[in-house]
Amino acid sequence: MPLLTIGDQFPAYQLTALIGGDLSKVDAKQPGDYFTTITSDEHPGKWRVVFFWPKDFTFVCPTEIAAFSKLNDEFEDRDAQILGVSIDSEFAHFQWRAQHNDLKTLPFPMLSDIKRELSQAAGVLNADGVADRVTFIVDPNNEIQFVSATAGSVGRNVDEVLRVLDALQSDELCACNWRKGDPTLDAGELLKASA
């Protein structure tokens, strides 16, 4: 399946996830208390930043996940939910988070796409059967507004994902390198100036 692109509807999903937050503070009576089911219907009216990484216990992936974690409040301020996805099990996610200092207090859920259904539907699976490093920004109408994919050896720029979300939410024409608070482009004024 080809990679989904701008204007496509993001696929429906129902996946087991490791909950977000400081796992050491969860009042868990049994292992299942660390997990939840997350569906595509869970965040109505919200923007979603859905990012896929190849595998847990790798080298580039935790740097990206930690970067999303550091900016989580910024995304929340923009009414956007971050959802991280890989083909690893929820138990692998748990073990990785428990062992990696930068992931221990991750504020958003880590979804397990162990059956590869969402990864396949989104077109992010590579020839090795793992997800490529892909980020989607999905609007409140479930329409994809941004897609970014990088080589496995290159981490994504989370600041750029936030910048693009700001630009999309401005609903204006935004020039190259535009940042929230910068003036937007006025097409009418630009047309007058060029006449």
Curated annotation (Swiss-Prot):
The keyword Transferase does not apply. GO terms for molecular function: hydroperoxide reductase activity; NADH-dependent peroxiredoxin activity; oxidoreductase activity; peroxidase activity; peroxiredoxin activity; thioredoxin peroxidase activity. Changing residue 61 to A/S: No enzyme activity. The keyword Cytoplasm applies. Keywords: Antioxidant, Cytoplasm, Disulfide bond, Oxidoreductase, Peroxidase, Redox-active center, Stress response. It is found in: Cytoplasm. Its main location: cytoplasm. Induction: Induced in isoniazid (INH)-resistant, KatG-deficient strains as well as in INH-sensitive strains when challenged with the drug. Increased expression in these strains probably compensates for loss of katG activity in detoxification of organic peroxides. A possible member of the dormancy regulon. Induced in response to reduced oxygen tension (hypoxia). It is hoped that this regulon will give insight into the latent, or dormant phase of infection. Residues 4-170 form the Thioredoxin domain. Changing residue 174 to S: In reconstituted in vitro system retains no enzyme activity. Its EC number is 1.11.1.28. It comes from the Bacteria. Transmembrane segments: none annotated. Homodimer; disulfide-linked, upon oxidation. 6 homodimers assemble to form a ring-like dodecamer. Identified in a complex with AhpD, DlaT and Lpd. Thiol-specific peroxidase that catalyzes the reduction of hydrogen peroxide and organic hydroperoxides to water and alcohols, respectively. Plays a role in cell protection against oxidative stress by detoxifying peroxides. Together with AhpD, DlaT and Lpd, constitutes an NADH-dependent peroxidase active against hydrogen and alkyl peroxides as well as serving as a peroxynitrite reductase, thus protecting the bacterium against reactive nitrogen intermediates and oxidative stress generated by the host immune system. Does not however seem to play a role in detoxification of isoniazid. The active site is a conserved redox-active cysteine residue, the peroxidatic cysteine (C(P)), which makes the nucleophilic attack on the peroxide substrate. The peroxide oxidizes the C(P)-SH to cysteine sulfenic acid (C(P)-SOH), which then reacts with another cysteine residue, the resolving cysteine (C(R)), to form a disulfide bridge. The disulfide is subsequently reduced by an appropriate electron donor to complete the catalytic cycle. In this typical 2-Cys peroxiredoxin, C(R) is provided by the other dimeric subunit to form an intersubunit disulfide. This is Alkyl hydroperoxide reductase C. It comes from Mycobacterium tuberculosis (strain ATCC 25618 / H37Rv). The gene is ahpC.
